[in-house]
Structures are given as C-alpha cells and as structure tokens.
Amino acid sequence: AATRVDENGLVNYAEIIGDSVLTGNNSNFDTGIGSWITYNGATLVHSTDKLEVTLTSGQSGARIDTNSLISGGQAGKTFKVRARIWQGTTTSTALKIFIGGAQENITISSTPTYFEFELTATNTGMLTIYRAVSGDTGTYFIDDVTAKEVTRDNVPRIDYTGGGCPHILAEPMRTNLIPYSEDLTEWNKGNLTIASNDIISPDGTQNADTLDVPDTNDFIYEGATTIASTEYVFSFYVKRGTIAESSLKLAVYDDTNNAFIVSDISYSASDSEWTRVTQSFTTPVGCILIRAYAFRNSSSTLGTFSVWGAQLEEGSYATSYIPNFGTALGVTRNQDIFTRDGIGSLINSTEGVLFLEIAALSDDGTNRILGMSNGGFNDSVLLRYDSGSNKITAQVRLGGAYECTLNYTVTDVLDYHKIAFKYKVNDFALWVDGFERDTEASGNVVSGLDELSLSVSSSNKFYGKIKQLQVYTTALTDTQLDALTS
C-alpha cells in the first residue's frame, strides 16, 4: 500500500516489475499458439500472428498454465497482465481476464485494444481469457499477451515530491480509514451527480471522479470509525472544474455526539493541476464515528470539480497516499525500515563522519533516531531529530551511557539540512549547513561498528526524507566538513 511521487510527478507504488513469464508464441503468436489450450470446448487456431478463439454457445475461451512458469508458483503474487483483444465474428463484447482466482471484466470491440490489469493470484488457476456467459459461436482474437510479476516488499520508496533531486521516503505505519478512497459513487451525497473515471488522476490513469454541483445545500462525505480524543488527518486530491474556488469547503462531523468538529473550512484548488488538501483535527470525548466531508456548502453554488485519493489516518500530519478499495477497517502501510548490517569493513569505529542531507516529515515533538551500531542501541553513533522543536542532536552512546551529546536548533526541520557528525576520541563536532554548531573535547568511541540503520532505536525509529547518506572512515578536516555541508 506504500506509494510515492515518481520522476514524472505521478502518485504510484514503489515496485519492481519483472520480465513477462510469457514469451515467444505464448505471447506474440508469431508462428503458433504456444502452450495455450482450450477452455470449456472453445477451438483455438493460429491466424497470422494472433490467436483465434472460436466460442461454444456457453462459457468458453483460451487459457495457459502460468503457475508452472513461475519459480515458487503464482499464489500470493501480484501480476500486471496485458493483452490485445478484439472481436472477430462474435457479437459478444463482455469477456473476462482471470489468473489464480482473481479476474477483471473487459469490453471488446472490432478494434484491436490493449487491456491491462493488476491481479493478485490466490491459487494456481491458469491465465484465462474467456466469455463467462452464453452467446453466439463466433470468434475473437488475442495477441501480445504478457504477465509480469510485481514486487513491492523491500523496495525503497524513491520520492520526487517537489521536483529536483529525489529522496528516500521513510514513514511510520499508517492506516487509511476511508473505505473507498477513489470511488466516490460509494460515498454519501446530496443532489450532486458523479461522473465516474472522468479525468486523469494523480496516478496517471483515467480513474478520477468528477462532481457536478447543481444547487445549494450539497455535500459528499464518507464515514469512518475512530478513537475518541485522538489526532487525525483528513486529506484528498482535488482539481477544480467550473466551480468557483470560494465555494470549495470541507468539514468533519462527530457522528457520535452529533456535532461538527470542523466546518466550512475553505481550501484552494487549481483548474490546471491536482492539489492535495489536508485538514488536521482531534476527535472529541466519546467520538467513535465521524463523517469526512470532501465538500459541504450551503451557499448558492454551481459547477464541477474532481476528487481522488481520499485518506483518513491517525496522526498529527498527513503521509503518502494509501489506496483503499473497499476495506471497511482500513488498509495499512507498514513502517519503512532500512538496515544494512555486516558492513564493518566500510565503517571506521575509531574515527569517522556520518553525513546526511535530510528533512523531517513534521516537527511533532518526538525523537526520530538513525545511526551506526555494533548490533544494538547501547553502543552506537547517532543522529536524531530531537523532541525539542526544530532540534538536531548528535550522540555517541557507549555501554548505554552517552559519551557526548551535541545539539543545534535550526529554523525549520521540515527544510532540508546538510548535517555531519565527526567522531573521534576526545574530538567530536556537529556541522550543519556549512558551520560548526557544537563540539565536545572529551569522550570515547564505540568499537566494532558494523551496522547502519534507521531503526537503531526500536522505540524511536527515524522517519523523514533522505537525499544523501554517507559514511567517511576518517575524521574530516574543518575545511572538508565546511565544503561537505555547505
């Protein structure tokens, strides 16, 4: 469920897409039909670089065993399935694409058309392209079929939010409590109408709904279960059509105590690009159910606007979008954990520099720690966002006690800062943005450093944006540290 903004400015998953398990005639039918076989009595023949399927009068089609082509089998794995399909003599237009218990409906025509879906297999069922109902005994054609495994676990999120150089995005665990984050037809609404999949969304596909507001007292909201006296953030992407910007207002309603938590909150929206709107609030005592309104306006207003990617999450700030396609209890994105161990040859325990260019996700009064260790927090070289507002701290911890603690308070931890922590026996220095900010002339260092981790402290893991992370095996000179952090 973890998304990021890619180099093209699109919101999508950080993933690795493998090669197609279908190759040669199993994919392109250049000289034959490969290993494709009949499903429920259909007739399959090779027809000039394509597969021709002659239907029976009932459910029928073509299929191929993909499970045997995949190391470890296909169950539990996600695939991008793509195929070009079109009518021959059949008048039927409704077909299905199936793999391992998952399927999607498609509508074909006489024009060769590509269909692409992401399907997660739950069993070994063959990849099947078929008509699921009775009909005529005509033909349809299949060509250019691919099935590529998609891997999202253990893939770092390289994020391009804001443009320019990317960063590694490390976020805490969050759950999107909005059950239908992209399908507004499932929301509760007033008199406004919804055009489904009307325009291109922030993920680059045509799956964003457009709302048409015809009169006064219109609204649209989704309900969610909450915990009383808890911080939440409601967010969504919006793009304005013909509606006046001044008419766009959101609200959050306490459905337990029958009162608004926030109401008539105006928000900005462009008519040329998507804007992410965020609203923080705290649930009142006893509140266990809320309504999150993406639009609520009692004034006389007309016009259109589009909404996509709604999210309600517990926390003090909004995190990256977590798609939810109908899970009432919410979809969870696990915390990002980065650890590299067994690198003792790359770290000098006697002296060195830990350098980062980082920005915080929030100045939220928590400790967020990363560092190098010999396998545990008690013996480590640390950099942290401190619980003090906008405070950066560097420390050496030996046997559970701190040998040195260096501090500097920046203007805003949400901005990127270049930070270098020099460590050496009786010689410690913290450099930030081209200046030496704090020093300590007494203290020992840790031996046997061999691990670099964003979760060196199990109770205070690091969350933030990382543009650069470097480890130097010598204590750099002041001139070098100046150049490195400037």
Please provide the spans of the model-predicted regions.
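Extracellular, beta-strand-rich glycan-interacting domains
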Residues: A1, G138-T151, L184, G303-A318, ...
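Extracellular carbohydrate-recognition regions
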Residues: A1-G41, D143-D144, K148-N191, A310, ...
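Short carbohydrate-recognition loop motifs
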Residues: T43-S60, D198-D218
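Extracellular glycan-recognition modules
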Residues: G88-S92, R174-S181, N188-N191, I227-S229, ...
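Short, solvent-exposed beta-strand-to-loop segments that form ligand-recognition rims
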Residues: E104-S110, L119, D264-Y267, F281, ...
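Short tryptophan-centered beta-strand motifs in secreted/extracellular beta-sheet-rich domains
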Residues: F115-L119, F234, V277-F281, L414-V432
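Flexible glycan-contacting loops in extracellular carbohydrate-active proteins
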Residues: T122-M126, L289, T304, E440-K465
